[in-house]
């Protein structure tokens, strides 16, 4: 049974804001043309590209080489742990020698072979390296604190962006080209503060109001 896989992408057309210099938003045809131009189609991947035969950007050649190397598999690089986690792994193994490499691998979310390499390694950080790491993390914490203080004082840029249209693009497995599946138009919300407040005509409110006057 063939299962049709549809991949949809959403793009927002902004009529104002710092993201666009034009006064009006992009049309759906222009967005589709831009996405199709920057995408790597299946036809380009299946064809044999030789030097000098086709004018293909370098980034497309690299992407095709990576896809050919993976052979259709998902890119899943091995996980790396920090030096602090390595020290914690060695300390855990020293205190609990009955733990196997598989147990430690499940705990730290790495492969058992990586656990064996870490335990066999005799490398340790010196006192100077520990002090440098401490000072680096201290400076990083100060920068993060300053960044949050600036955000509290300044307005967010996202509040200045008005979204007027949302174009939903889609493609199927038979054709690599994208098509516009839906276009939604949003009206900006304008609070009307000039309208007078309506008087409450509830009977309980009127009786309470008359009782307070007496």
From Swiss-Prot:
It is found in: Mitochondrion. Signal peptide: none annotated. One of its GO terms (biological process) is mitochondrion organization. Residues 1-18 form a transit peptide. The keyword Membrane does not apply. Keywords: Mitochondrion, Transit peptide. Its main location: mitochondrion. It comes from the Eukaryota. Present with 1160 molecules/cell in log phase SD medium. This is Required for respiratory growth protein 9, mitochondrial. The lineage of its organism: Eukaryota, Fungi, Dikarya, Ascomycota, Saccharomycotina.
């Amino acid at each position: 049974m063939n299962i049709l896989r549809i991949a949809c992408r959403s793009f927002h057309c902004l009529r104002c804001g710092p993201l666009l210099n034009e006064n009006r938003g992009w049309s759906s045809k222009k967005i589709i043309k831009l996405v199709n131009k920057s995408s790597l189609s299946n036809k380009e991947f299946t064809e044999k590209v030789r030097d000098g035969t086709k004018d293909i950007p370098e980034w497309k050649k690299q992407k095709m080489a990576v896809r050919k190397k993976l052979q259709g598999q998902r890119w899943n690089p091995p996980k790396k742990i920090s030096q602090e986690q390595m020290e914690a792994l060695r300390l855990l193994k020293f205190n609990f020698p009955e733990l196997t490499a598989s147990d430690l691998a499940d705990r730290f979310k790495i492969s058992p072979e990586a656990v064996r390499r870490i335990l066999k390694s005799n490398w340790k950080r010196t006192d100077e390296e520990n002090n440098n790491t401490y000072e680096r993390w201290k400076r990083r914490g100060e920068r993060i604190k300053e960044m949050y203080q600036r955000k509290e004082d300044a307005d967010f840029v996202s509040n200045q962006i008005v979204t007027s249209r949302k174009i939903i693009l889609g493609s199927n497995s038979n054709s690599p080209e994208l098509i516009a599946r839906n276009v939604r138009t949003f009206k900006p919300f304008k609070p009307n503060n000039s309208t007078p407040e309506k008087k409450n005509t509830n009977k309980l409110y009127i009786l309470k109001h008359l009782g307070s006057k007496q």
